[in-house]
Design a protein with these regions (language model features):
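Short catalytic/metal-binding and nucleic-acid-binding patches
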Residues: 1-175
Length: 175
């Protein structure tokens, strides 16, 4: 198996996709408070800024900025996944391999990350994040989805309250 090399950019800004192992489950929104608590706990121990985020039933997307001199997002994701998993009852199916390693069968082992290159790249990824609930059919409009940073960013003037409605959305595919 090829060894994946992660980006190492101290103080960098990154887009992430993290998914449940069983993509038909709805654990992330059914246990949203536990997920928020896991994020807050890790953020208190190993600070990072959440620039944008959306939580869907079976996966999440977010953009983080790490502190100056710090490039270790992997340890943060490991801790978030671990804390969230420990908060849930043991009800998932486990493979022999995961069981032997003492793992839970909740998360996919890996995650996708992309180093944000510039302001345009950041804007494109923020739009992608916030439009994702509509794309996946979980909401009719961006403003209808409660599990994202969209509402916070509307208050800050980054987005108009009706952003994502009708024709005011540019192409949402990421290159």
């Amino acid at each position: 198996m090829p060894r994946y090399i992660r980006a190492h950019i101290p103080g960098g800004t990154f887009f992430f996709t993290v998914a449940l192992l069983e993509r038909k489950r709805r654990l992330l929104i059914e246990h949203i408070d536990a997920l928020r608590k896991a994020f807050a706990s890790v953020q208190a121990q190993r600070p990072f800024t959440i620039d944008a985020a959306v939580i869907l039933p079976d996966h999440l997307h977010c953009i983080w900025t790490l502190p100056e001199g710090d490039a270790d997002f992997s340890a943060r994701w490991h801790a978030i996944k671990s804390r969230f998993s420990r908060s849930l009852p043991n009800q998932e199916r486990l493979s022999t391999r995961r069981s032997a390693k003492g793992e839970r069968g909740i998360w996919q082992r890996r995650f996708w990350e992309h180093a944000i290159r510039d302001d345009e790249d950041l804007a494109r990824h923020m739009d992608y994040i916030h439009y994702n609930p509509v794309k996946h059919g979980h909401a009719r409009s961006v403003a209808d989805w409660p599990y994202s940073t969209f509402h916070r960013l509307v208050k800050r003037g980054v987005y108009a309250p009706d952003w994502g409605a009708g024709d005011n959305v540019r192409a949402m595919e990421l290159a």
